[in-house]
Swiss-Prot record:
The surface protein (SU) attaches the virus to the host cell by binding to its receptor. This interaction triggers the refolding of the transmembrane protein (TM) and is thought to activate its fusogenic potential by unmasking its fusion peptide. Fusion occurs at the host cell plasma membrane. The transmembrane protein (TM) acts as a class I viral fusion protein. Under the current model, the protein has at least 3 conformational states: pre-fusion native state, pre-hairpin intermediate state, and post-fusion hairpin state. During viral and target cell membrane fusion, the coiled coil regions (heptad repeats) assume a trimer-of-hairpins structure, positioning the fusion peptide in close proximity to the C-terminal region of the ectodomain. The formation of this structure appears to drive apposition and subsequent fusion of viral and target cell membranes. Residues 1-410 are extracellular. It comes from Feline leukemia virus (strain C/FA27). One of its GO terms (biological process) is symbiont entry into host cell. Glycans are attached at residues 6, 21, 227, 262, 267, 294, 334, 350, 370. This is Envelope glycoprotein. The gene is env. One of its GO terms (cellular component) is viral envelope.
Length: 410
């Protein structure tokens, strides 16, 4: 749930099937709910432009003082109240009221409106958005001068946005209230490009550990030059680093573990076996104390997806905890912080991760943490290497004194 996506919210004019606004941001699926801005004329287009032919057959505009064709109409449109009715959940409307369909703007009866800018202040406790009138600096209305501000409610932040949701907007005026239909939809894409399923890049590197060369390097001697001409210098050829196989990489892990153990407790390395585990989990989290960074926008370190998998049960030690830690896991916490309110991102220091109850992440979204009642521990990720006394390993290779035989058949 803490994964960062590229989230784009699109407002579409249904009648003309044109995009009225698109707003993109980086965030999680829990906190990526920005304030959307759109102009009323982008929702309306030319649908509020009734054209009536005059007596000569020429097209002329009607006397209606609304629409977006001319500056004076857009200016007059600012004075009209408007109200918005949802069409995405007709069953949640007022009981006993028929709100109609798209041809009515889902506002066939009073009481169906859930938001808007009108003297009776339409409101709702269950709809997903609020739509209010914004402020415009274009007094001449030569450009866009009917801004609307769309915000998501708490119900909207909890809703499923798998598909577009529709609303109807109507002007409140004497006579017929014109209708504008629009949808709000969410598009989600990953930051990193998708990884191909194959081929497996590890398989070509499955090589045994390279053996140490037993022969020392020999320096060849040359006879002195008989002529006086100086020998030509040959430029040394530069070779790139040789790509080591999986065997060498695994051996390097064990050797690194040995060096760390020998530096801290040399008595344990006199006679021992260090073994990599052969089944998951291949890693272990060590809880640590550290200073995280608090960001209002996700930093680049939050955009990567950890390739490793780890659960809280594979974390040991004591470190920094964020969130509400249950009693069963308080032993992991040397220091506990409640975090922050609002849309903040807590980025772990370089080389560390947050081990949360919901998985491993380089970054914590406080919106997700507060919404899910999750908790996280700051950890370093280390490969699991088991330590064995020599006797334990020798027993696996020593032959038994007596072997089990088949019972005698009579």
């Amino acid at each position: 749930p803490h994964q960062i996506y590229n989230v784009t919210w699109v407002i579409t004019n249904v009648q003309t099937n044109t995009q009225a606004n698109a707003t993109s941001m980086l965030g999680t699926l829990t906190d990526a709910y920005p304030t959307l801005h759109v102009d009323l004329c982008d929702l309306v287009g030319n649908t509020w432009e009734p054209i009536v032919p005059d007596l000569r057959g020429w097209a002329s505009y009607s006397s209606s003082k609304y629409g977006c064709k001319t500056a004076d109409r857009k200016k007059q449109q600012q004075t009209y109240p408007f109200y918005v009715c949802p069409g995405h959940a007709p069953s949640l409307g007022p009981k006993g009221t028929h709100c109609g369909g798209a041809q009515d703007g889902f506002c066939a009866a009073w009481g169906c409106e859930t938001t808007g800018e009108a003297w009776w202040k339409p409101t709702s406790s269950w709809d997903y958005i609020t739509v209010k009138r914004g402020s415009s600096q274009d007094n001449s209305c030569e450009g866009k001068c009917n801004p609307l501000v769309l915000q998501f409610t708490q119900k909207g932040r909890q809703a499923s946005w798998d598909g577009p949701k529709m609303w109807g907007l109507r002007l409140y005026r004497t006579g017929y209230d014109p209708i504008a239909l629009f949808t709000v939809s969410r598009q989600v894409s990953t930051i990193t490009p998708p990884q191909a399923m194959g081929p497996n890049l590890v398989l070509p590197d499955r090589k045994p550990p390279s053996r140490q060369s037993q022969t020392g390097s020999k320096v060849a001697t040359q006879r002195p030059q008989t002529n006086e001409s100086a020998p030509r210098s040959i430029a040394p050829t530069t070779m790139g680093p040789k790509r080591i196989g999986t065997g060498d990489r695994l051996i390097n892990l064990v050797q690194g573990t040995y060096l760390a153990l020998n530096a801290t407790d040399p008595n344990k390395t006199k006679d021992c076996w260090l073994c990599l585990v052969s089944r998951p989990p291949y890693y272990e989290g060590i809880a640590i104390l550290g200073n995280y960074s608090n960001q209002t926008n996700p930093p680049p370190s939050c955009l990567s997806i950890p390739q490793h998998k780890l659960t809280i049960s594979e974390v040991s030690g004591q470190g920094l905890c964020i969130g509400t830690v249950p009693k069963t896991h308080q032993a992991l916490c040397n220091e506990t912080q409640q975090g922050h309110t609002g849309a903040h991102y807590l980025a772990a220091p370089n080389g560390t991760y947050w081990a949360c109850n919901t998985g491993l992440t380089p970054c914590i979204s406080m919106a997700v943490l507060n919404w899910t009642s999750d908790f996280c521990v700051l950890i370093e990720l280390w490969p699991r290497v088991t330590y064995h006394q020599p006797e334990y390993v020798y027993t696996h290779f020593a032959k038994a004194v007596r072997f089990r035989r088949e019972p005698i058949s009579l």
